[in-house]
Each structure stands twice: as C-alpha cells, then as structure tokens.
C-alpha cells in the first residue's frame, strides 16, 4: 500500500493571482514561509531548515509542472513512492472573488494528520509574512 493523497484548501484574503503566485512558485517566495532558505537551480528546488550554526535539514524537490498563475507541482527527490508529489494551485471564488490556495500532498496513512499540521503551520507563516 502506498501513500495516500491529502487535499487541503486555504482561503486567502486577496484577489491578486500575481501576489499569491510569487509566494508559491519562486524560491524567494517559498523562503518566506516554507523553509529558512530555498534555492532554485535548473528546476530543482533546495529547501533548508535550520541555521548555518545549528543542525540543518536539507531536501530537494524536482519541478514536475509549472503553469503560471495556476499551479506548481514538485516531487521530493528522496521519495520512493512513484505516485507521490506535492502541488500548490490557486483558484478564485465565483462568489467573493477572493483566492483559495489548494495543496495536494501525499503521506503514509499514519502520518496524514502530522502532514496536515505541517501545512497549517506553513500557511500561518505565509499569513504572517504576507498578510494573505
């Protein structure tokens, strides 16, 4: 049995696709809310958690899909589950005009709640950093 898909939706307080897109698709934007440092070189995003003088966790993700102002899909390089990836996409509410950030990720059944909590924390940092 493989990892299970998790779908999460976060309503945002903006109507600007470009503002949200910058936060979810660029190394600079991701660095504001996902990790301490993020770099992008030839479609490989490297995420570093921790500071230089402490223990660090470094993971890399390969860019699989990129559709501007729509979605970005990445796959952790060390993930052996062929079907697993993580994706962030933006949609607009027909009712309010505000945007929603959709997260798709994959986790083992016993780790789904922990992964959801991790994304909740990431989105709290996004809100604090950008007001979204």
Segments predicted by a language model, with ranges:
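Hydrophobic ligand-binding cavity/cleft-lining segments
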Residues: 1-39
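Charge-dense, helix-prone N-terminal extensions
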Residues: 3, 58, 94-96
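Short, surface-exposed coil-to-beta transition loops
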Residues: 5-7, 56-60, 82-87
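Generic structural detector for well-ordered beta-strands
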Residues: 9-13, 62, 89
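A short, structured loop/turn motif at beta-sheet edges
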Residues: 17, 64-69, 90-99
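Hydrophobic pocket/interface hotspot
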Residues: 19-24, 30, 45, 63, ...
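Glycine-rich portal/gate segments that line the openings of hydrophobic small-molecule binding cavities
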Residues: 31-78
């Amino acid at each position: 049995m493989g990892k299970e898909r998790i779908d999460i939706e976060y309503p945002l307080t903006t109507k600007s696709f470009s503002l949200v897109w910058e936060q979810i698709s660029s190394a600079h934007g991701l660095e504001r809310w996902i990790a301490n440092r993020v770099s992008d070189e030839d479609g490989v995003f490297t995420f570093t958690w921790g500071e230089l003088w402490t223990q660090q966790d470094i993971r890399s993700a390969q860019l699989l899909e990129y559709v501007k102002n729509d979605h970005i899909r990445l796959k952790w390089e060390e993930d052996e589950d062929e079907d697993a990836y993580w994706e962030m996409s933006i949609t607009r509410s027909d009712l309010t005009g505000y945007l929603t950030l959709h997260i798709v990720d994959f986790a083992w059944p016993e780790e789904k709640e922990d992964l959801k909590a991790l994304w909740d924390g990431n989105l709290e940092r996004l809100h604090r950093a950008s007001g979204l």
